[in-house]
Amino acid sequence: YCTPQETTDRLREFVSNGGHLVSTMRSFVTDDEVTVWHDRAPHNLTDVFGMTYNQFTRPNGHVSVEFAGTLAKTPASDAQALIELVTPFDGTDVLAGYGHYVWKDYAAVTRHGFGKGDAEWIATLLDADTIQAVLREAVEHAGIADAGTALAGQVTVRRGTNARGERVT
């Protein structure tokens, strides 16, 4: 929610130089003094995320999130607590939308290429299994999945550094 200008500048540069950024709803709304930014949301990053929003609402009951594209095999899930009404720009991949007659034209999950990288926006709260599937796909898309990723939820892999500074698994 609160983000200093320096942070948005660094995130912009990170994605432009090949980084993969995942962010969630209600990010980049105010500066570090909690003063609301006066440009389009998300502040200083609309072109990075390839979208904007100026409204959000509570789902008040059943509002399904329906997946498409690289997330098409993810089962539909209900939005939880809050939904942003995201308007994607041309060239932005919509990976999920709302299965509700009023909000069907808004995106729930987007991904947009910017520079050498890309940025993904998750515009609602999702249940644990669904957010795990969304984040797993984002990690795979970024090419940073490792051997432990395929075993997530089945085997616990612990990593760390021992007293001698050696990496242990």
Tell what function each PLM region has.
Residues C2-T169:
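A conserved amphipathic helix/loop scaffold
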